[in-house]
Regions:
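ATP-binding/phosphotransfer module of carbohydrate and carboxylate kinases, centering on a glycine-rich
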Residues: 1-68, 75-84, 108-109, 128-134, ...
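Solvent-exposed beta-strand sheet faces enriched in polar/charged residues
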Residues: 90, 119, 273-277
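Phosphate-binding/catalytic loop of phosphoryl-transfer enzymes
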Residues: 94-197, 343-346
Length: 347
């Protein structure tokens, strides 16, 4: 596959719910961009995820009018050569050095790009949200992550491997807590809560225990518990004390991660950018946002807290341009061109 406008960077942001992919020229010009289903190796498997990346890369070129016809799913012969000089792949689940090496080797075998750069999706969010490339990012989508980068380049990141690494949060954590509270309220082990009806209703069921049995029996994917995150916040806003407790716990966990990371970077007195990225931060629950910001400010008074205002794939593209030594003007142009509106839904 070739494109007349030379693609310097293939930028990829892979989450557990979606994949954003963009082809970018060396001067920051956007060649094409698409949004498709998740290509996460954790969600769909490594080979299927790579097949999706090939399909999406082909579509990104086709969006610009320069690419070939879309290949059949899994058609690995559709790529006679690299589509870009460098590929910046920012992937959910690229959490350990071993993950990064394994993913880089697998991506390299597909021949999508001449040079492969693999990072975690938190790296993309931080690079997109912090213009100078340093600060802290809290990622709270289906899962949870925290990354901090010092102005000198030193990085601190949480393991982000769930309860086995001391982490709690994300949509899945909220959903699991909501289900547990609904079950305990129903059987008398805990206080009554409006979620006793709302939790099963989300999945077309009637009782909380039906949700448990559906997950246990393989009829309902456990990852779908993340769908309960908006339900938790909605019930919390209605005055349900149990739901409010879960939302407060999430705010405290997120703030604690940010403050601890900033302390480890020895930046407590600095005006540290703290970027909030991920679907959970789109909640309209004001108490959650107030509590989160207050907890961070209590530990880092000069922290500059802001929600990420651009797609994280912008950060992946910037990391690729950084690797190429592109001038700042290229990044400025990219930020203007690579917007949510330019991410064409994959067909």
């Amino acid at each position: 596959m070739t494109v007349p406008v030379a693609a310097a960077v293939l930028a990829v942001d892979v989450g557990n719910a979606k994949t954003d992919l963009a082809l970018v020229a060396a001067d920051g010009t956007l060649i094409g961009a698409v949004r498709g289903p998740s290509a996460s190796h954790q969600a769909v498997g490594l080979e299927r995820g790579l097949d999706r990346l090939v399909e999406l890369a082909t579509q990104a070129a086709a969006v610009s009018g320069h690419g070939p016809a879309r290949p059949a799913p899994g058609d690995r012969s559709a790529l006679p050569g690299p589509v870009a000089q460098i590929g910046a792949f920012c992937l959910a689940g690229a959490d350990t050095p071993g993950d990064i090496r394994r993913l880089a080797r697998a991506i390299g075998r597909r021949g999508l790009v001449a040079d492969v750069l693999v990072r975690n999706d938190a790296d993309a969010a931080l690079r997109a949200g912090a213009p100078d490339g340093w600060g802290v990012v809290l990622v709270c989508g289906e899962g949870f992550n925290c990354l901090g980068v010092h102005p000198d380049g030193r990085a601190i990141r949480l393991p982000a491997l769930g309860e086995i690494s001391g982490d709690w949060g994300g949509g899945h954590g909220l959903g699991m807590a909501a289900l547990a509270a609904a079950l305990r309220g129903r059987d008398g082990r805990g206080p009554r809560t409006a979620r006793e009806a709302a939790v099963p209703a989300q999945f077309g069921l009637h009782r909380p225990l039906e949700v448990t049995y559906a997950i246990y029996g393989g009829r309902l994917a456990e990852r779908r518990l993340g769908e309960l995150a908006p339900v938790v916040f909605a019930i919390a806003r209605s005055g349900d004390a149990v739901a409010r407790g879960i939302a407060d716990h999430l705010a405290d966990e997120l703030a604690g991660a940010a403050v601890a990371t900033i302390r480890r970077l020895r930046l407590v007195r600095a005006a540290v950018p703290v970027i909030l990225s991920g679907g959970v931060f789109r909640t309209e629950d004001p108490e959650f946002h107030v509590r989160l910001r207050a907890r961070i400010a209590a530990g880092v008074p000069r922290a500059r807290i802001a929600r990420l205002g651009v797609p994280p794939v912008v950060g992946a593209a910037l990391l690729g341009l950084d690797r190429l030594g592109a001038p700042a003007a290229a990044g400025d142009r990219l930020r203007l061109e690579l917007t949510e509106a330019r991410l064409t839904p994959a067909s």
